[in-house]
């Protein structure tokens, strides 16, 4: 069963200022917790476009949302196709869009998906099971230089070079096939003293490989920039991130669109062309409550940022 506890469920949706007849987009359907909370606030004229690249999540969501199916359009696609998705549905602008980034609990907890460093499984990590690139190809076929780059950039792993060297040495003998094989190789690349600090020694490398396999940061950047153009004036975008790379990227994008073009000096009135595209609703990210943490330990690293469209 695809069971998933949504993080900051109320805040994410409530900050969208839901209109009961509005049109909204859930870019990361997952376990459908946020979707259900939102749909309970929509009347029969309201509509939710629910996007996920994981077919298992969509099939599960149809059961979770069975009382609201007449208000939902399910889309199996990557959220970086947001504009195309809305164009195909003949929707010009929507009232709000939200993202719950990162891997959902069911994807982590089902060993066969290969996301977890706690369970043995084939190296996979594909959110979209129909794509060809998996963790196996990244680990066994990407160059030493490419591995160092993703471990450092996406995992902020200070022992990136040592770990990549160990992977390179192992795969020359035989392919690294499973998650726990990879964990053992990662541990070889980290000094014993460092392994005892900062959580599981494989956490950062697994995160880096997952981001690379699913092209997560690039896809999010593409999608949220499209979202800014797809939301009506007064509408909002909510984003929950789970690690510093995502949060930094979200903050930078919102800041960039909040700044607006440089205004020429001496203008008595600022023309609309020089007004910013959006304003940040919260300057500092909202973090999980104690209730969230009690229900889901993964909420500890969650941050919520919200922006309102101005033009």
UniProtKB/Swiss-Prot annotation:
Where S-adenosyl-L-methionine binds, per the record, is at 32-34, 52, 79, 100, 107
Q: Where in the cell is it found?
A: Cytoplasm
The catalysed reaction is: cytidine(1402) in 16S rRNA + S-adenosyl-L-methionine = N(4)-methylcytidine(1402) in 16S rRNA + S-adenosyl-L-homocysteine + H(+)
* A biological process term (GO) from this entry: rRNA base methylation
Record's keyword annotation contains Oxidoreductase: no
Molecular functions per Gene Ontology: rRNA (cytosine-N4-)-methyltransferase activity
What GO cellular component is one of the record's annotations? Answer: cytoplasm
UniProt keyword terms in alphabetical order = Cytoplasm, Methyltransferase, rRNA processing, S-adenosyl-L-methionine, Transferase
The similarity annotation says: Belongs to the methyltransferase superfamily. RsmH family.
Cited function: Specifically methylates the N4 position of cytidine in position 1402 (C1402) of 16S rRNA.
Protein name per the record: Ribosomal RNA small subunit methyltransferase H
Q: Which gene encodes it?
A: rsmH
